[in-house]
């Protein structure tokens, strides 16, 4: 699969960038940066929505949650303080989030829309 991981900065991936990458065979985007698309909106603007409709788009709050999860892990009582335990915990959380999203709809597209739907339901 052709994979793109925008990780350097926020709001830099334009509609033209996405269209050019899709034309070159892009299949998956895993957002490493917070808010990587050049939308005014922080959550699910028009560029992100169009991209989500065309490729497998893993949203930043899943693919970029590693350090946030590490902090949450250390807030728990009596955790193992090893690299392996921390990595396994973050991997398990990310894996569960992806699996929940897939269980809602197994399509290769609209992953971010489904992930936001799940996250918002958990908050309300």
Task: Kindly give the residue locations of the regions a language model identified.
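Rossmann-like NAD(P)-binding element
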Residues: 1-15, 31
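Activation/maturation switch segments at domain boundaries
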Residues: 11-19, 23-26
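Adenosine-phosphate binding glycine-rich loop
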Residues: 22-124
